[in-house]
Amino acid sequence: MISPVHQVLREGTRDRHETLDHGLALADGDVDRGNYLAYLRALLGWLEPLEERLWQLDWPRELRAPERAGKTTWLYEDLQAAGDTAPIVHCAHPPQVAAPNAYALGVAYVVEGSQLGGRFLAKRLQSTAPELPQRYLRGYEEEVGPLWKAFLLYLDSEAGARDREAQALQGARDAFDSLTGWLRSQGALRA
């Protein structure tokens, strides 16, 4: 059963999510090494400055923030495994998260939800390009389900119980818009 706040975020970002998904060549299995590495570099350029702030906020223990804070490490591992030494350009304007509030949870919804999408892409790439490093796409691996459920429970208890669904939705929309714009500006998203 989907939680009320999750439903608000899912419905309120559906068009943005679809735009992002349809723009990714990876989703079609249309992948070559150069495009894949460019995608990883662009994603890292967006995620690193955001992750540095997002998971350093004063979140309660039940959100398990320290376990969520290593996604940029996985991207660096993939680039290193591929022998990629191209410079990383960082997004100058990722979503601004300043407090552990509903807005930041909306941003985190996009970051954490990408772990579900990454697993889908990893399965697809295993059959079309198994030689490409996929640590980031594998994400939390067997912990993806428990971590996602814990995130949704916290999201619902914080944003839903305090009638802050609109703030969470704005954070999620800003994250999708920022990520899509950044990937497009870096040539990592189809037009």
Identify the residue ranges that each predicted region occupies.
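Metal- and O2-centered redox machinery and metal/ROS homeostasis
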Residues: 1-191
